[in-house]
């Protein structure tokens, strides 16, 4: 292995060596002439400059600026620059002071009275007070002085400035109190009238479509119900068979404080130590048990709770865990195997001894304007002498037409009609005879309120799935 050569160290510059070795006198012979400018080249330049002058041409090692006067065209002279001279002060007037002049200078100027030669007019008074003087003893007449109270004049000045860049139609101006001689004067309007025109506004948004909304405040539409996702893939399913899940669910998670179980309708939060064991293995690492909810699933009433496990916790404090759906079925909803015979609500015929509407009577209108053909009924149309019972069989759908209404009643079985008691009906003549068209066939007139529509004629209702709901009518957190 060849030996390693030592690295070459850089020598200090001449300026650095000159600063350290000049005082001690140990400088190399080439350092002092180079720094002080006494080399052979420097001496040749000094000797040559004595005989030749190139200062005006700008020849040298400096920047090519043409010297102090700059570059000028050939055959011309450089411009003359006037140099400023010394400033000249204004002359100061000097007053001579003699020996007889006073040494005290007055700070106030002497005022002189100028007589312009204007005569002073005489002013003659036409009224006033008469002054009486006496030389001896007290005055016999007391002095009467007419003293009138001075007029109390109140002057209030208010200055108001308005910004032309901002005008508010409803600017509240607070009152400006002004107190003069113990009096408080307030006279300022509080609300200034506006100058704009009031235009009634109309509502143009009439739909509740929130997808194509062009305004900032759309009309709120129906709110969709929240989906809990109890049976999703990310939620574990754990059935609970013990009844303590309904009354005291905290006993299935922890042993702490068995005397206080908390409210079963609220969300339960648990704080576990680092090493613990749950009473029920299914409730291991549960840190939160949300509010109960009721639902209908597979023909039974089910009580459900969402639990949150704590599987991992980072140094920052972030917790990770899975969601568990704990449910307990209360009772199955099954159909009874016992068959109960149902009794009909109404009979097929109305008997004469029926007492459903004993206080109601059937009143028939006058049918003198009705064209009746092929009538096999024995119901009287005018006066009634005694109550009668008539039974009529109709093989088809009969109908009756009058000037007031058309009535069609389907009957395919013998009907017994109770005529009612004797009533006198007043006959009112008509101005014109109406024309009625009545189809061929039998008819029957029924008047009463004691009949019920058969259940088979009702519309069938579609069953909707039972949604999930909470015991306290709030969404679980």
Curated annotation (Swiss-Prot):
GO molecular function ontology, one term from the record: DNA binding
Cell compartments where the protein resides: Virion; Host nucleus; Host early endosome; Host Golgi apparatus
Listed GO CC annotations: host cell; host cell endosome; host cell Golgi apparatus; host cell nucleus; viral capsid
Record-linked InterPro entries: Late_L2
Pfam families named in the record: Late_protein_L2 (PF00513)
Bridged cysteine pairs (disulfide): 21-27
Motif window: Nuclear localization signal: 1-12, 459-466
Keywords: Capsid protein, Cytoplasmic inwards viral transport, Disulfide bond, DNA-binding, Host endosome, Host Golgi apparatus, Host nucleus, Host-virus interaction, Late protein, Microtubular inwards viral transport, Phosphoprotein, Viral penetration into host nucleus, Virion, Virus entry into host cell
Signal peptide extent: none
PTM statement from Swiss-Prot or TrEMBL: Highly phosphorylated.
GO BP field: microtubule-dependent intracellular transport of viral material towards nucleus; symbiont entry into host cell; viral penetration into host nucleus
Subunit structure of this chain's protein: Interacts with major capsid protein L1. Interacts with E2; this interaction inhibits E2 transcriptional activity but not the DNA replication function E2. Interacts with host GADD45GIP1. Interacts with host HSPA8; this interaction is required for L2 nuclear translocation. Interacts with host importins KPNB2 and KPNB3. Forms a complex with importin alpha2-beta1 heterodimers via interaction with the importin alpha2 adapter. Interacts with host DYNLT1; this interaction is essential for virus intracellular transport during entry.
Family: Belongs to the papillomaviridae L2 protein family.
Biological role: Minor protein of the capsid that localizes along the inner surface of the virion, within the central cavities beneath the L1 pentamers. Plays a role in capsid stabilization through interaction with the major capsid protein L1. Once the virion enters the host cell, L2 escorts the genomic DNA into the nucleus by promoting escape from the endosomal compartments and traffic through the host Golgi network.
Name of the protein described by the UniProt record: Minor capsid protein L2
Source organism of this protein record: Human papillomavirus 42
């Amino acid at each position: 292995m060849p030996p390693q050569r030592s690295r070459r160290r850089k020598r200090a510059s001449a300026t650095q060596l000159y600063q350290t070795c000049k005082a001690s006198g140990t400088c190399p012979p080439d350092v002092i002439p180079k720094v002080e400018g006494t080399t052979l080249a420097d001496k040749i330049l000094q000797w040559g400059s004595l005989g030749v002058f190139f200062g005006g041409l700008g020849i040298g090692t400096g920047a090519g600026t043409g010297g102090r006067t700059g570059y000028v065209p050939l055959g011309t002279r450089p411009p003359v620059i006037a140099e400023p001279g010394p400033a000249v002060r204004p002359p100061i007037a000097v007053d001579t002071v003699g020996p007889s002049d006073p040494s005290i200078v007055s700070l106030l100027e002497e005022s002189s009275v100028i007589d312009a030669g204007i005569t002073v007019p005489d002013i003659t008074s036409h009224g006033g007070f008469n002054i009486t003087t006496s030389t001896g003893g007290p005055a016999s007449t007391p002095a009467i002085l007419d003293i009138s109270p001075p007029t109390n004049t109140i002057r209030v000045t208010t200055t108001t400035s308005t910004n032309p860049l901002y005008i508010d139609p409803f600017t509240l101006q607070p009152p400006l109190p002004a107190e003069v001689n113990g009096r408080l004067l307030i006279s300022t309007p509080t609300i200034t009238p506006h100058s704009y025109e009031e235009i009634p506004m109309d509502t143009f948004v009439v739909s509740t479509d929130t997808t194509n909304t062009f305004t900032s405040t759309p009309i709120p539409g129906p709110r969709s119900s929240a989906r809990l996702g109890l049976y999703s893939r990310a939620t574990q399913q754990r059935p609970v068979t013990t009844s303590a899940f309904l009354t005291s669910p905290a006993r299935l998670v922890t042993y702490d404080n068995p005397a206080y179980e908390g409210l079963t309708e609220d969300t339960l939060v648990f704080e576990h130590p680092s090493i613990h064991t749950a009473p029920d293995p299914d409730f291991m690492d549960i840190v939160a048990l949300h509010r109960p909810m009721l639902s209908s699933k597979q023909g039974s009433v089910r009580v459900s709770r969402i639990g949150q496990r704590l599987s991992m916790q980072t140094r920052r404090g972030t917790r990770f865990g899975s969601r568990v759906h704990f449910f307990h079925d209360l009772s199955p909803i099954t159909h009874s195997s016992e068959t109960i015979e149902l009794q009909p609500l109404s009979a097929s015929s109305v008997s004469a001894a029926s007492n459903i509407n004993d206080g109601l009577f059937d009143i028939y209108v006058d049918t003198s304007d009705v064209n009746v053909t092929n009538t096999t009924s024995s119901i009287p149309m005018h006066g009634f002498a005694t109550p009668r019972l008539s039974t009529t069989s109709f093989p088809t759908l009969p109908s009756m037409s009058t000037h007031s209404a058309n009535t069609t009643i389907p009957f395919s079985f013998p009907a017994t009609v109770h005529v009612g008691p004797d009533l006198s009906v007043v006959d009112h003549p008509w101005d014109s005879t109406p024309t009625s068209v009545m189809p061929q066939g039998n008819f029957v007139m029924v008047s009463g309120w004691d009949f019920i529509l058969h259940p088979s004629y009702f519309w069938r209702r579609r069953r909707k799935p039972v949604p999930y709901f909470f015991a306290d009518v709030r969404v679980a957190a």
